[in-house]
Amino acid sequence: MKYSIARQFEKNRKLRADNFVLVYQMGKVGSSSIEHTLEARNIPSYHIHTFDDHEEFHMYHNKKDVSKFFDFKNRAMYRLVLNQRKRILQKREQIKIVTLIRDPIATVFSRFFQDLHLQFIEGKKNDAIHRDMEVTYKHLEHCFDNYINLNYFADWFDNELKRNFSIDVMRQEIDNTQPFFTFNNHKASVILIKCEQLSSLDKEIGDFLNVDNFVLKNSNEAKNKWYSNIHQYFKQHYDFSKLFYMYDLPLYRHIYSQQEREAFKTKWLKTPGTKSA
């Protein structure tokens, strides 16, 4: 059984280990190499996006479509397990948390395609969605524009890190030209890393974790996804300037410098479908 007592007991034991690390961030911000490295070093860790539910239920407005991919009983059990694990972690005397942030448009775009199956429920009603690239694109453009809850990404640190571990990244004054930041209170120590700078921070992450000779290992995620053709077509045709307002949201203005945010815009302006502001 997925949620057998023995399996949960072993997981809970790991959550209480002295050198335990919580990898806690919104999806698609580049944490896989950290997870892989911790596992290779036999450092107990737990990777989670939210302690409330499967992340997809927070991330998309078309929840009826999302629910078709999750068994009701398993989902209810999963939520109970998440709540139990959260309580265990909150009761620790001290906890180290690794979290990341990424260009918001890159985050949203990557996550949408990871969850692409959620948007093909309509394909059962319209066979052309599976046969014609332009029809498929128009369908996905509609889904991208209307079904993603963009507030989920902008509010993640308040809804998760602040609510569950009393770490408020917005209250602390930071130099947002730096590649990472640390936050601390009486129970939690957090390192917040810009995904774009992750590969150059081996020593800094190792120092935070008190791990000697820490070197990030490639997660070897497969690049040839089943959706690669429509992914490329979408990227060539979509007007990403519709999401440029995200760079002016409080979270991204706080964490990323003006120069970094302008560089993100410049990158997306190079895609053929994106219009100049």
Language model region names:
Residues 1-277:
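Membrane-interface amphipathic segments in extracytoplasmic regions
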